[in-house]
């Protein structure tokens, strides 16, 4: 059996978002596991995936150190970062990301 480690991150609740699904979904996946069926053609049948959920503070100063600590502790094969976009009407994949610290609202430290 192949074993894989995954880290899935989501942001803590913030102003205007009392419960952030971007952190609740990773927590649920970590607790419940991935739904592997007993069908012989299930691609996850011979794969054990351990999911580590990490809640990221809404803070420019603390977000990366929190995620980095989890990555170093768990040594994942994959890291999936999630977020909440109010205008989205479902699950969306980012086509590109910009490493730019800009926000309309202040972060948790301000």
Segments the model singles out, each with a brief description of its role:
Residues 1-110:
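N-terminal catalytic or cofactor-binding beta/alpha core of small enzyme domains
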């Amino acid at each position: 059996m192949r074993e894989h480690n995954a880290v899935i991150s989501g942001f803590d609740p913030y102003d205007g978002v009392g419960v952030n699904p971007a952190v609740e979904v990773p927590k649920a996946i970590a607790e419940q596991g991935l739904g592997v069926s007993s069908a012989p053609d299930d691609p996850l049948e011979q794969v054990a995936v351990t999911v580590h959920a990490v809640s990221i503070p809404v803070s420019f100063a603390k977000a990366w150190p929190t995620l980095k600590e989890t990555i170093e502790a768990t040594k994942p094969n994959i890291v999936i970062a999630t977020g909440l976009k109010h205008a989205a009407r479902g699950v969306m994949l980012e086509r590109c990301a910009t490493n730019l610290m800009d926000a309309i609202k202040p972060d948790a430290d301000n």
